[in-house]
Amino acid sequence: MTIMSDLPRDLLAEILSRVPLTSLRAVRLTCKKWNDLSKDRSFLKKQIVETKKKQLESKEIEVIMMRNFRVYLTSIDIHNNVDPSFTPKGTLISLSDDANHHQVDNVSRVFHCDGLLLCITKDLHYRLVVWNPYFGQTRWIQPRNSYHRKDNYALGYDEKKNHKILRLKDNYYAPRERICEFELYSFESNSWKVVLDVSPDWYIPSYNRGLSLKGNTYWYATEKHVNVDFLICFDFTTEKFGPRLPLPFNATESPTYEDVVTLSSVGEEQLAVLFQSEYTLMMEIWVTSKVESTEVLWNKLFLEVDLIAISSHFQFLAEAGSFFIDQKKNVVVVFDKDMDEATDRDMAYVVGKNGYFKKVDIGEEAYTSCFPLVCSYVPSSEQIRQLT
C-alpha cells in the first residue's frame, strides 16, 4: 500500500500546496520530509499561486485581523444572499517569544508588507518583532536606544528586496517633550542608523499606520501649523522621503476636531483612501490610477455615501477605520469599534451604492485601547535570516 511519504515529490508538493495556511504547522510536524518540502521555494511558489487563485475564484476573502492583541487569519464572505459573515480560521502559525517560547498574545500594532508582519508588543518597554507567519520565522529587533509608546513604524524593502524598518518619533502635540527622530533598521546589517537628511515641516499622527505598496510606505500627513494635508512616501531604496503627493480632497485636523483619513490597497498596484468629513459625515473612497514614490494620480471615485442618512452621529474613529474594497460586489468593508454599547464591540460595516449598508458584530473587544485592524494576506517567500 502506498503511503503519503512514498509519493513522488512533485505529486506530494501538489497535494500539500492545497493545504490551508492554518494547517501548515500540523503538516510540518508530521515528518521531516514534509517540513523541508513546505519550506522549498518551488513549493512556496505553488502555494502562493494556489492562494491567489482561490482568492479570485472564491466568494470568501482571507485577511489578517488583529483583535484583543492577537493576530488571526479570518475568512470574510460578503457575497452570500443573507448577511455578511466573518469566520475566524484560527491564529496563524504561533508567534512565540524566542526567550521563553511562550505564545505572544500582546500585539498592540501590526504593520504589513509583502507577506511579512512587523508586530509591536505592549510590554512595559515595547518590543519589535518581524514575523513571517508562513514559515513561522521571527526576528526580535533590538533598539538603538529605546522604543517609545508613540513611535510610528514602516516595513518595506529596496530595489534589491532587502527589507528595512523605518522608525518615526515626532511628538508634535507635546512641545515640552518634543522629540523628532527618524531611524532606519537594515535586516542585512542587523543595525540601526539615523536618517540625517530629514527636517520635516509636516507631521504624521502616531496612530496613522501608513500603507506599504511595492516596497515603499505612504502616510497621510499634515503641514505643521497650517491646515494643508497630503500624502508623503518613504522610498526604501533612496532611504528618503519623497515630495508631497496630492489627495483628491481637503481634510481638517486639529487638537479639537479631525476628519477621518485611512489608506488601503487594491491588489498589488493601486492605492485607495477613505475620507470622512466630521461635519458632513460624507464618506468618500478614492482609488489611484498611478502611484509611485514621487507621483500619485487619482481618477476614480469608487464610492460616495452620505452616512448621516444612517445615523446623525455615524463617524469612524481616527484610530480605527481600516478597510478593504471588494470590486466584485462594488462595496467597501470598514472595520471600527462601537463604543456606545455597554461593552466595546468590534464592528464591520459593509457599505455600497444605492443605500446598501450592513452592520456586522465581530465580537466583544476586551480592551478599550485595542482597535480592529485588517489587511489582506498572501504568503511570503522571504525567509527571515536568523541571527547567530
Curated annotation (Swiss-Prot):
Residues 1-47 form the F-box domain. This is F-box protein At5g42460. Pfam families: F-box, FBA_1. CDD domains: F-box_AtFBW1-like. It comes from Arabidopsis thaliana. InterPro entries: F-box-assoc_dom_typ1, F-box-assoc_interact_dom, F-box-like_dom_sf, F-box_dom, Gal_Oxase/kelch_b-propeller, SCF_F-box_component.
